């Protein structure tokens, strides 16, 4: 059984809505201040500010093309703001050397691709790049960091396997191990459960919750609203490049707010396992119109 095995949801050790309402936190290490972010001169987000509470499990939710991943790319330094700034540990993140950022912040991007034929151990070892120096190459500390990351994700038995031989769930855990090998306190995850079956989704979410309880700040973009409500203690809800709400799951995941964000009629009930909010869709009428597209079918 992987070493990250966590208490059953709803047990005393598991986070509850009450726990989430009053987390012990310091000043935010990571925040966006009045940022404008976009691509090729076309802004997706304009004048947005957001704080990531230190020690939190923050989840960013919202419909497709609302700016969730764009915000995460800005927070990770992959996308430079056209205006405003992203601040990491009191400094503008774009002014910091890439290796310095990588020693403080780890990122799991969407649809990461491994080099052909690379083994699990070699891929996870790439997480140590930020710790290499001209006069300090691979060391026993690097070896320990890789082994600990493999062990934490339950992928140590796969170390000698080629990544392209693994299942989708195994491959995603290997990518998480690579990020853990960076040994950062901040982890940014862009849709980490996409394309996984429900069992692998829950397994990964339990791993992230375990890492959060172990002291890491987690920031994840998720499509599954009920995963967000169950595992996060801080939710940022977006629509059309704006933040509509932020706060605890009980504050953000309400029936009226969910309909405002997604246009989805719904009922929010008590999760029978955690006691937190659980969204039950009422359904929406079928339409031949493609959401988010213009009359020609081209995405808006």
Predicted regions and their residues:
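Conserved ABC ATPase "signature" region
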Residues: 125, 140-158
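Helix-to-loop junction immediately C-terminal to a conserved catalytic motif
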Residues: 76
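Conserved ABC transporter NBD signature motif
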Residues: 84-92, 101
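Conserved ABC ATPase signature
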Residues: 137, 162-166
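Catalytic Walker B motif of ABC-type/P-loop ATPase nucleotide-binding domains
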Residues: 187-191
């Amino acid at each position: 059984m992987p070493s990250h095995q966590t208490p059953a949801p709803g047990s005393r050790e598991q986070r509850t809505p009450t726990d989430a309402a009053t987390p012990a936190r310091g000043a935010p290490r990571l925040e966006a201040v009045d940022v404008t972010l976009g691509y090729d001169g076309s802004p997706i987000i304009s004048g947005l500010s957001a704080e990531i509470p230190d020690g939190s499990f923050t989840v960013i939710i919202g419909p497709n093309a609302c700016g969730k991943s764009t915000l995460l790319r800005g927070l990770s330094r992959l996308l430079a703001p056209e205006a405003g700034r992203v601040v990491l540990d009191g400094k503008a993140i774009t002014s910091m050397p890439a290796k310095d950022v990588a020693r403080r912040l780890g990122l799991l991007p969407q649809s990461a691709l491994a080099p052909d034929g690379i083994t699990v151990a070699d891929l996870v070892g790439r997480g140590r790049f930020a710790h290499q120096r001209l006069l300090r190459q691979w060391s026993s500390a690097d070896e320990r960091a890789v082994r600990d990351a493999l062990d934490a994700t339950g992928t140590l038995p796969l170390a000698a396997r080629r990544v392209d031989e693994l299942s989708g769930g195994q491959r995603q855990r290997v990518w998480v191990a690579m990020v853990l090998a960076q040994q950062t306190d901040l982890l940014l995850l862009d849709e980490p459960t996409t394309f996984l079956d429900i069992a692998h989704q829950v397994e990964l979410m339990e791993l992230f919750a375990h890492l959060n309880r172990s002291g890491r700040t987690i920031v994840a973009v998720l499509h599954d609203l009920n995963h967000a409500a169950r595992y996060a203690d801080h939710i940022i809800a977006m629509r059309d490049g704006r933040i509509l709400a932020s706060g605890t799951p009980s504050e953000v995941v309400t029936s009226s707010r969910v309909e405002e964000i997604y246009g989805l009629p719904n009922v929010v009930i008590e999760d029978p396992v955690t006691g937190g909010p659980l969204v039950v869709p009422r359904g929406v009428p079928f339409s031949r119109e493609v959401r988010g597209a213009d009359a020609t079918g081209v995405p808006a």
